[in-house]
A protein has these predicted regions:
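OB-fold/S1-family single-stranded nucleic acid-binding modules
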Residues: 88-104
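A short, sequence-level motif marking secondary-structure junctions
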Residues: 29-32, 57-64, 99-101
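Structural detector for short beta-strands of small beta-barrel domains
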Residues: 21-43
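OB-fold (S1/OB) nucleic-acid-binding surfaces
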Residues: 40-60
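Positively charged n-region of N-terminal signal peptides that target proteins for export
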Residues: 1-4
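Short nucleic-acid-contacting surface segments enriched for D/E, G, S/T with interspersed K/R
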Residues: 65-82
Length: 104
């Protein structure tokens, strides 16, 4: 019985800690202004993966220029980016964000 309990705990621990970093080309923009997310106040960076939007942790919305610039700002346009990270607790924990569109 102890062996079964030990194996159950071990398998559970391994499956929970196996969060693999994913790499996607996804839409990236302001969660509130463009993706209609409302669980944060102010403007925050978000990505849309498979038609679902997630707030981004690890990068600030102004890290890529003025968020309110009418041609390139995340509050004004939806852009494309190559993103790497982990989906965790309904948020995207980003380790890398590289814009891949040609907006300047």
């Amino acid at each position: 019985m102890k062996k079964i309990l030990f194996l159950s705990v071990l398998i559970s621990t391994l499956s929970c800690s196996n969060k693999k970093e994913v790499k996607h080309v996804a839409e990236i923009s302001c969660g509130q202004c463009q993706f209609e997310l409302d669980s944060e106040t102010g403007c925050d960076l978000a990505v849309r993966i498979d038609s679902k939007a997630y707030f981004v942790d690890g990068f600030d919305i102004d890290a890529f220029g003025d968020a309110h610039d009418e041609h390139t700002g995340f509050c004004e346009v939806i852009r494309k980016a190559e993103i790497k990270g982990v989906l965790e607790n309904g948020r995207f924990k980003a380790s890398s964000v590289k814009l891949v569109d040609n907006l300047k």
